[in-house]
Amino acid sequence: WLSLLFLRFWLPATFDLLSWEPASLFPVSPVLLLDRISWPYALALSTLALAAILTDISRSTETNRLTWVGSLAFTALGILAAMAGNPLTLMLAWAALDLIELVIMLLRVNPVEQREQVVITFSARAAGILALAAAAGLSSEIPLSFTQIAPQSSIFLLLGAGLRLGVFPLHLPFLEQAPLQRGLGTLFTLLPAG
């Protein structure tokens, strides 16, 4: 949390994660961008995780370190998604977020009906990633970035965001019935929307 607070003084900052080779096959590589737009989101996500952990400490007599690890890992991936400098980085962060959420939810949810709803939600979010990949494929003449969006790919970007936020398909969040602890359940509800 403090590191994000101090990074405010060095905006904008770009961090190259990897250099994928060959450049003819991978025209863009994963990049993190910390600017005036992504910094407040990253700080809000880290503050949310800090609040969830602090309230978890004050609420329970024994601390569950696995819940803390899940919360911190999920928050770190949410911050990566908020700081994504290009759609490739966003797709990778979304996929990692979805896989961690799927594993944790399937381990914690017992009735078959709730597991089915977890898989349906995961499938809708995976379709959002595929829509973003389709947008990247349609803009093959110029590499897809958040500054240059081809007109034919904008509908797929909108569809991908709608699927990620739960707008399409219209469904109630499954976390109302899921037996999750308050801190982890709050993070699972708010982080993917961030």
PLM segments and residue spans:
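A cytosolic-side transmembrane-helix exit/cap motif
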Residues: 11-19, 109-123, 172-175
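Alpha-helical multi-pass transmembrane bundles of energy-transducing inner-membrane proteins
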Residues: 69-152, 159-167, 184-185
